[in-house]
């Protein structure tokens, strides 16, 4: 449901029944860990508690790796290693502060530096030219594209 947000809002929840925001986009890691913890509790009659706890302790790192892979795939970029997760967090914070549509950044900056001209000619050029975006733009442009040939697809032909 995040694809259809009018702008990035990490507190948005698409679940009509979620009055407390437990399943808000920005709380997904906490909600997933909470759910896994509940599952671990249910498994204690048939599994060792220490083994269950060990497994739960690997979740934060596994989530960060998965998030890096997913976001970089959406951006059509190759992860660089250390600092990639911090970049994603900073990008999401900027997206929310700028109130830019969630999908827009992924389209505008797909492939990194090769998309700079398209991004700066698009409807959100002013946001991308703002000083607040400059460090993120520098990072995006520094990442290697995953498959530059994908930019030849007609999808990227217009803003």
Please place each PLM-identified region on the residue numbering.
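Flexible glycine/proline-rich, aromatic-decorated loop/lid segments
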Residues: 2-17
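Regulatory N- and C-terminal appendages and interdomain linkers associated
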Residues: 21-159
